[in-house]
Amino acid sequence: MTRLGFVLDSGSCIGCHACTVVCKSEHEVPLGVNRTWLKYVETGSHPQTDRHFSVMRCNHCEDAPCMSICPTNALFRADNGVVDFDDDNCIGCKSCMNACPYDALYIHPETMTAHKCNFCNHRVTEGLEPACVVVCPTQAIRVGDLDDPNSELAQLHASGEGLVRSPEQNTKPRVIY
């Protein structure tokens, strides 16, 4: 079995927004919404301040609350472990948006259906990497398979050194920082 996930290295991210731009282009994401976005984290106090960047997106959770609450099964787990969506089955009820602790879903303003990062599953199933991984100039975004003990993702997960967002939610995210 394959369980794909992301390693997001906030220390390497330079805040260039290449990932957000390529995602918008790859998926024709309209203005005003994003599948991937950057969070600016500023620390310290004047005059000694620092700014870090963190890539935010769907966490493709093992126990995805968006999937379990969806009344039409529009959100589903693909064979590679990715939480994907079927636009044709979505009724736009927003239950998934309310259930997601990571604020990763949005309603597409034209189709009025839920959308989110789908790991560029159309690319991955063809043996390609997600567009954000390809375009990142510092390799701050990497992919791996949690079921492959040799992958960086699996090793980071096993070591306990990687961090996940909101671990108290018990969703078992597949995005490790």
Listing of model-derived features with the role each one plays in the protein:
Residues 1-177:
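Non-ligating segments of multi-cofactor redox enzymes
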